[in-house]
Swiss-Prot record:
It holds the Pfam family Macro. This is Uncharacterized protein PYRAB06560. It comes from Pyrococcus abyssi (strain GE5 / Orsay). PROSITE patterns: MACRO. Disulfide bonds: none annotated. It comes from the Archaea. Residues 1-182 form the Macro domain. InterPro entries: Macro_dom, Macro_dom-like.
Length: 183
């Protein structure tokens, strides 16, 4: 089941939450900063943990579209979170094209596959690339819906996927996009 919800992803109850990270996992702003702050209290410490895990899991100091890094939830465990899955979406700067859609699909699918591999049943995503990366929210929501619904047809463990939107305005825009797509 794919559902769009209004709320704070750092307080959302899901087994995994996804961080919309930059490729160096520096968590300097937006939802990445909020997740790092909520997980550790000390953003620089969470950056250190993230970079250490990236070197262990990927073998280098950056991740590409579709790659993910998993870190412990630390303080987020109180919400039932078992994993934070970091992925990188495309930078749009207000421009959307097929290349950006493909990169976003890779980011979403990479996180979903990793969650399924980890045995996760519920996973919460922010609107990857729709914030400071400047991708149009409407296109991000459409891409999420298509990728998630296709993935759920063959998922072994993941059953519940949430797109968690912090602002009321973004939530209402997303609902309108989904309603239009249903017609």
């Amino acid at each position: 089941m794919f559902r769009v919800v209004h709320g704070d992803i750092t307080r959302f109850k899901a087994e995994a939450i996804v961080n919309a990270a930059n490729k160096y996992l520096e968590h300097g702003g937006g939802v990445a900063y909020a997740i790092a702050k909520a997980a550790s209290g000390d953003v620089s410490e969470y950056i250190r943990i993230s970079k250490e895990e990236m070197r262990k899991q990927i073998g280098r100091d950056w991740i590409e579209h579709g790659e993910v890094v998993v870190t412990p939830p630390l303080n987020l465990a109180k919400n039932g979170v078992k994993y934070v899955i970091h992925t990188v979406g495309p930078y749009c700067g207000g421009k959307w094209d097929e290349d950006k859609r493909k990169k976003l699909e890779l980011a979403i699918l990479g996180a979903l596959k990793k969650a399924d591999e980890l045995g996760v049943r519920s996973i919460a995503f922010p609107a990857i690339s729709a914030g400071i990366y400047g991708c149009p929210l409407e296109e991000v929501v459409k891409t999420f819906k298509l990728v998630v619904n296709e993935f759920l047809k063959s998922a072994k463990n993941v059953t519940d996927v949430y797109l968690v939107l912090y602002s009321e305005r973004d939530y209402e825009v997303a609902l309108k996009v989904l309603e239009r797509d249903e017609l």
